[in-house]
A protein has these predicted regions:
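An extended, acidic
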Residues: 62-165
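Hydrophobic alpha-helical membrane segments, chiefly transmembrane helices and signal peptide h-regions
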Residues: 25-27, 133
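Key DNA-contact positions within bacterial/archaeal DNA-binding proteins
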Residues: 30
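A short, flexible low-complexity segment enriched in Lys/Arg and Gly/Pro that occurs
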Residues: 1-10, 94-95, 99
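Generic hydrophobic secondary-structure packing signal
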Residues: 1, 21-24, 39, 127-128, ...
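Short acidic alpha-helix initiation/capping motifs at coil-to-helix transition points
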Residues: 21-23, 48, 105-111
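An amphipathic alpha-helix adjacent to DNA-recognition modules
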Residues: 2-3, 10, 14-15, 19, ...
Length: 165
């Protein structure tokens, strides 16, 4: 069911109907609801893997904000629904938990890059989080053949904005 939901969200975003997920999974909607009582429960189950991947990818001490942005581009090609979820209204504790994990890894990278002189002292965690969301959205919205160029343009803007002054 989670694999089916990942595919459906990749195609239709978080607003894709539960019925589409159930159909793709080859189960009835009742079965889907028994395991996942609402859309958020299913989305969180699907995207825990994305957060874990970002955490693992950025954990080594030599990893930077650039490494995070590269991985976000890879994930955005598959699904903007993940970025939609972690930048959504965080009043739901399940979503807030994923958002907090993402925020913690960005905090770590900002501190690391600032200490190494790779970014300016003016760069805040919220700036990088916003850049991540913008990058993922632009890449996912672009035609597949134009995605590398869209990512390069966005990355050039962020590099200029984040550079030490």
């Amino acid at each position: 069911m989670i694999a089916a939901a990942r595919e459906v969200y990749a195609e239709g975003g978080l607003q894709a109907p539960f019925s589409a997920v159930a159909k793709r999974a080859g189960v009835g909607q009742g079965s889907l609801y028994r395991h996942f009582p609402d859309r958020t429960a299913l989305a969180v189950a699907v995207f825990q893997d994305n957060v874990r991947d970002l955490e693992d990818h950025t954990a080594p001490p030599d990893r930077t904000i650039d490494d995070l942005l590269d991985r976000v581009v890879d994930q955005a090609v598959v699904s903007t629904a993940f970025i939609e979820l972690i930048t959504a209204d965080l009043s739901d504790r399940r979503v807030a938990s994923l958002g907090a994990r993402f925020q913690a890894l960005v905090d770590r990278l900002v501190a690391r890059d600032r200490a190494a002189g790779r970014i300016g002292s003016h760069v805040e965690t919220d700036d990088v989080t916003m850049a991540t969301s913008m990058l993922a959205t632009e890449v996912a919205r672009a035609e597949p053949a134009l995605r590398p160029a869209a990512a390069r343009r966005a990355r050039a803007l962020f590099a200029a904005a984040f550079a030490p002054r």
